[in-house]
Design a protein with these regions (language model features):
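PRPP-associated nucleotide enzymes
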Residues: 1-250
Length: 250
């Protein structure tokens, strides 16, 4: 475990929160802004970027090309979002984020480990402006398939983010509990702004209203794996987002 003294925090994720944080807030005695919940209002949403995917869009794994299961024989039910669709969407998201940032002040991309590793790699390469990378690992899952609402930092940031324009890079938002907690945690560190770009979101699973500025796909409330997403540390290596067979987790 690395990072600051807050690298081993646990507790219920607070209700509420927003998907963006921009300036403002009361000044603390050390000159760093202490941003309250009311400051987490976020910027203008980019709802037009989001594509809606339904279960009907899934391609049964048996109908896909031979070898599409990448050796996970009988474990995957379907391909929900193929690799080409992922690449195209990431290009769109990168263009939108770049348009909202000044090239002279590179955004600091905070990748939420481990699930967002594939996404942040392709996203950073697709950005037409310079960026910097940081990594943070938080968990509220354990071995369960749904969020517990209890958040723990496994790896903290390796640098001070005071005055930085931060973009949190998330693989998936389901309950919103973990992201809400993370936004509040980062707000205490004095960034100039915080936005969130998420590849996937499950609207039906949301428990906390988190205003995420950039979302690639809204997907059904089913257990998905691939492209960084795992179940029991498996399936991260898949180049697509797929549906895990129910017999694998029930």
């Amino acid at each position: 475990m690395t990072g600051s003294d807050s690298s081993s925090l646990a507790g219920p994720a607070p209700e509420g929160g927003g998907g963006g944080l921009h300036g403002g807030g009361a000044a603390a005695s050390n000159g760093v802004a202490n941003l309250s919940v009311s400051d987490l209002s976020g910027g203008e949403s980019r709802a037009h970027l989001t594509s809606r995917i339904t279960s009907a869009d899934a391609v049964p794994i048996g109908d896909a090309d031979p070898g599409a299961d990448h050796g996970y024989h009988g474990e995957l039910a379907a391909i929900l979002i193929g690799d080409e669709a992922l690449k195209a969407k990431i290009a769109v998201l990168a263009k939108a984020v770049a348009a909202d940032h000044d090239q002279d002040t590179p955004p600091l991309l905070i990748c939420v480990l481990k699930g967002a590793v594939m996404f942040v790699t392709d996203f950073a390469r697709a950005l037409p402006i310079p960026s910097e990378l940081e990594f943070m690992a938080v968990t509220s899952y354990g071995s369960a398939t749904t969020s517990s609402g209890v958040v723990r930092i496994l790896k903290d940031l390796d640098r001070d983010i005071t005055g930085r324009r931060v973009v949190i890079v998330e693989d998936i938002i389901d309950s919103g509990l973990t992201l809400s907690w993370l936004l509040r945690n980062l707000a205490t560190r004095g960034p100039a702004s915080v936005d969130v770009v998420a590849l996937l979101r499950k609207p039906e699973a949301i428990k906390v209203d988190v205003d995420v500025r950039y979302v690639g796909f809204d997907i059904p409330n089913e257990f998905v794996v691939g492209y960084g997403l795992d179940y029991g540390e498996r399936y991260r290596d898949l180049p697509f987002v797929g549906l895990l067979g129910e017999h694998m987790y029930r």
